[in-house]
Amino acid sequence: MNLEQKSDALYDFTVTSLTDILNAGVDVCMVQVGNEINKGMSGETFMSSVAELLKAGSSAVREVSKAAGKDIQVAVHYTDIDKQGEVAKITADLEKYGVDYDIFAMSYYSFWHGSMENMQDMAEYVQDTYGKKVVIAETSYCYTSEDGDGSGNSVSGDGDLVDGYDATVQGQADMLRDICAAADEADIM
């Protein structure tokens, strides 16, 4: 498929699936277009092309939302928020290419994406510079370093955990509590 065909397919799929979901009685308040799309989306890697896909998805959400008399928010989702330059470039490109969205969704894994203060700084940058809401779309923390499925873990528990947060049930609970508190402090949804 070329870019135009992909954009049309994404638009059609979003209209159909969102309409079906609403018709089933689900109260949808947000639709995320793309998932951790720093490196591209649907085989497209140039930001100008990714922006076309995002605009197609956003347009579909806006159309269905209006027809249903709803206020459904549009989110775009990125990772690697520990790199301020990356967040600045992504948000500048979203603006440059005219992507219509309400929420900048980000993944925050404390063992990969830096301190909670950095997460707050990135959120505040997006909020202050572009007036967008920010949400943490993904996070987690391990409660054990044991391999439970034979596939190998993303985090080994050997030097890659965050100081003060053990790989225990309590360590996981403490981390998630502290992430939620830091997010709340920075007005992150």
Predicted regions mapped to residue ranges:
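Catalytic metal-binding/acid-base residues of hydrolase active sites
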Residues: 36-38, 80, 107-110, 140-142
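Aromatic-lined glycan-binding groove of carbohydrate-active enzymes
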Residues: 98, 103, 115-116, 122-151
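Short acidic/His/Gly/Ser-rich catalytic and metal-binding motifs that mark active-site loops
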Residues: 1, 39-42, 143-150
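Short, charged, low-hydrophobicity "junction" segments
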Residues: 107, 113-120, 167-170
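Conserved, mostly hydrophobic/aromatic
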Residues: 31, 57, 104, 138, ...
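Active-site cleft segment of glycoside hydrolase catalytic domains centered on the general acid/base Glu
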Residues: 2-101, 114-122, 129
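Substrate-binding cleft of secreted/luminal carbohydrate-active enzymes
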Residues: 111, 133-139, 144-145, 155-189
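Aromatic- and acidic-residue-enriched segments that line the glycan-binding/catalytic groove
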Residues: 1, 48, 150-157
